[in-house]
Design a protein with these regions (language model features):
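Catalytic alpha/beta active-site cores
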Residues: 1-265, 269, 290, 295-298, ...
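Short, well-ordered amphipathic alpha-helical segments that serve as non-catalytic structural scaffolds
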Residues: 238-241, 279-283
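Loop-rich catalytic cores of soluble enzymes, especially ATP-dependent carboxylate-amine ligases
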Residues: 263, 270-273, 319-327
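Extended amphipathic alpha-helical segments enriched in small hydrophobics
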Residues: 269-281
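Structured mid-domain segments that build the active-site/substrate or prosthetic-cofactor binding neighborhood
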Residues: 282-287, 298-301, 311-321, 335-357
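Active-site-adjacent loop and "lid" segments of alpha/beta metabolic enzymes
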Residues: 324-336
Length: 357
C-alpha cells in the first residue's frame, strides 16, 4: 500500500503556502484576495481558491474507508447506484408496459405514483406482472392512509410469486410530515399511524417505509445547509417519537429512507451527501440501537452500526429548471447527477429537462 505522504515529483522544489499567496497577490495587482477569489457561500462559510495538505491535518474523516462507520465515503465498499425512473400510474396495464420497456433500456429502480383509491391487490398484480421483485428495486408513493394496506398487498403478492422476501428491495413512501410542511395543517396521531406502518413493514425486511422527503426544501430554494438540517431533524423526530412509543431504535432507523434534492451547487452537493451520512450515523448511534442479529458491525458498546447506515435517494432539482432555454436544463441535470454519484447516493432520478412545460 502506498504511503499517504509519499513524495511525488521530487525533482520539483516544494512551494510553501506563503509563496503561493505571494504569487497570487502579485497577480491580482492590488485587488483584495478575499474579494476576488474567496467564494462566500450562502451556507455561511467561505471557500478558498486552493487548499493544501496542511488544511486537512487532524481531520478524522480523511481516514474513513468506504463501508465503515461513520460512512462518510458511503455505506458500502463500492460506489454503485441505481438509476430510478418514476411512473405516474393512471392505467395499471399501461404503467406495467412502460415499466418493462424502461427496464429493458437500463433502468434499475422503478418508482410508482399511485392514487390511494386505486390501491388493491388486483391492480398491484397487474402493475407488477413480469417484473422480478428480487431483481428490481420497487418504490411506491401513495396516500398515507393506504401505506399500511399497500405493504400487506405487496408482501402477499411477493409470497405468491415465490420470491425471497429478504431479497426484495424497495420502499413505500409513508410521509406524515408532508401535510404540515406543504399544507400547513397539523397531522394528529401520526406517531400511532407511523408505528402501525413500521410494524406492517416487518413483513418486507428489505423495504424502507418511513420517508424523509427533503427534496421539498430543495425545490423551494433552500440552501444546502437548510435542506440537510431539516432532513436530519425530520429523521431524528422519527427516532425520538417512535422509540418513546417503545419501538426498538434499530428497527426504526433501518426503515427510514432519505429522499434529497440535488441543486446545481456541484462541490457542496458532494459534501452534503458525505456530511449527511456521517451526521445521521452519529444521531442513530446516540440512541444505542441494539443489534438484533449476530453481526460483526458493532460499536464499542455493542450498538448496531448497520442501523446507522443512511439510505439515500436523490432527485435533480426542479427549482432551477428554465422555460426559456430548456436544453440548458440538460447541462444542469447532468452536473447535478454527477455530484450525487460522487457523493455516494444509493439511487437517483434525473428529472426530464422539459418537466416544467
Amino acid at each position: 500500500m502506498a504511503e499517504l505522504k509519499e513524495k511525488l515529483f521530487s525533482e520539483f522544489a516544494p512551494v510553501s503556502t506563503e509563496e503561493w499567496m505571494a504569487k497570487i497577490t502579485a497577480d491580482l495587482k492590488g485587488v483584495p484576495f478575499e474579494k476576488k477569489l474567496v467564494w462566500k457561500t450562502g451556507e455561511g462559510f467561505n471557500v478558498n481558491p486552493f487548499y493544501r495538505a496542511e488544511d486537512i491535518e487532524g481531520l478524522k474523516t480523511t481516514e474513513s474507508l468506504p463501508g465503515e462507520f461513520p460512512y462518510v465515503r458511503g455505506t458500502k465498499k463500492d460506489n454503485d447506484w441505481k438509476v430510478r425512473q418514476n411512473i405516474e400510474v393512471t392505467c395499471f396495464k399501461g404503467a406495467n408496459e412502460k415499466a418493462l420497456d424502461i427496464l429493458n433500456k437500463g433502468v434499475t429502480s422503478l418508482g410508482f405514483i399511485i392514487k390511494g383509491s386505486d390501491v388493491n391487490a388486483e391492480n398491484i398484480a397487474t402493475l407488477l406482472d413480469g417484473i422480478c421483485p428480487e431483481c428490481v428495486e420497487l418504490n411506491f408513493n401513495t396516500c398515507n392512509c393506504k401505506a399500511e394496506m399497500l405493504i400487506g398487498i405487496l408482501a402477499d403478492y411477493f409470497k405468491g410469486k415465490g420470491a425471497d422476501l429478504e431479497k426484495c428491495k424497495g420502499s413505500v413512501n409513508y410521509d406524515p410530515f408532508k401535510k404540515p410542511l406543504v399544507k400547513g395543517k397539523e397531522n394528529e396521531n401520526w406517531v400511532e399511524a407511523a408505528a402501525a406502518v413500521l410494524k406492517a413493514g416487518a413483513a418486507l425486511p428489505g423495504y424502507k417505509v418511513l420517508a424523509v422527503n427533503a427534496f421539498y426544501f430543495n425545490n423551494a430554494g433552500a440552501y444546502i445547509s437548510q435542506e440537510l438540517g431539516y432532513a436530519l431533524a425530520w429523521g431524528n423526530e422519527y427516532m425520538s417519537q417512535l422509540t418513546e412509543a417503545e419501538l426498538p431504535a434499530a428497527i426504526v432507523a433501518k426503515k427510514i429512507k432519505f429522499n434529497f434534492g440535488i441543486s446545481s451547487n456541484y462541490f457542496l452537493e458532494i459534501a452534503k451527501f458525505r456530511a449527511a451520512r456521517m451526521l445521521w450515523a452519529n444521531i442513530v448511534a446516540s440512541y444505542n440501537p441494539e443489534c438484533l442479529r449476530d453481526c460483526e458491525n458493532k460499536g464499542p458498546n455493542g450498538e448496531c452500526r448497520c442501523a446507522a447506515k443512511m439510505k439515500v435517494h436523490a432527485e435533480t432539482s426542479t427549482f432551477n429548471l428554465t422555460l426559456f432555454d430548456a436544453h440548458v436544463n440538460l447541462l444542469r441535470t447532468q452536473t447535478e447527477a454527477m455530484s450525487a454519484a460522487l457523493g455516494g447516493v444509493d439511487s437517483m432520478t434525473v428529472v426530464p429537462f422539459d418537466k416544467t412545460f
